[in-house]
Swiss-Prot record:
GO terms for biological process: rRNA processing. It is an enzyme of class 3 (hydrolase). This is Endoribonuclease YbeY. Belongs to the endoribonuclease YbeY family. The keyword Glycosyltransferase does not apply. The gene is ybeY. Pfam families: YbeY. Zn(2+) binds at residues 142, 146, 152. Single strand-specific metallo-endoribonuclease involved in late-stage 70S ribosome quality control and in maturation of the 3' terminus of the 16S rRNA. It comes from Synechococcus sp. (strain CC9311).
Amino acid sequence: MITIDLAFSPASADLIDAADDEGTRSRLQEAGDWECELSAWIEALRQDHGNHCPEVVRTCDSLSLGISLLDDASIAELNLHWRQKPTPTDVLSFAALESEMPMVAGQELELGDIVVSVPTARRQALEQKHGLERELRWLVSHGLLHLLSWDHPDEDALAAMLQKQEHLLGMGSNVRS
């Protein structure tokens, strides 16, 4: 089983206070559930040789990544700086992996960072008629796939990515929909 070193930046107190249930509050302020779920997701992706999982990820023992849960203004600032889009977005991924990156035995592999807008996730959860916790998991799974070199330049690639996200979310977590 892979070891995950998660740098977790929780949501602000006002975003946590607005959460509807304890499970969602936990996801917004604690790293534990994320560490367990990311570990399971990455292990499943490493085992599935039919997907896009870089060889360096398949063979490493330990990796690190970050999750930051932000407000719309903060993610809009990042979106403007990195994508020249002056609006909030649901999730941004900042991948650290480069293709054919050499790996030293025993060295921790840095995947990158996933940044999620909690208010945007909340709006999308309402639109999709499911809970905020599920939407947060959906967005983090999407960000994780981007960190692992997945992309969606066309409809077929997007469909494959969305199907993989559904698979990851279906792996089992005690989530209220």
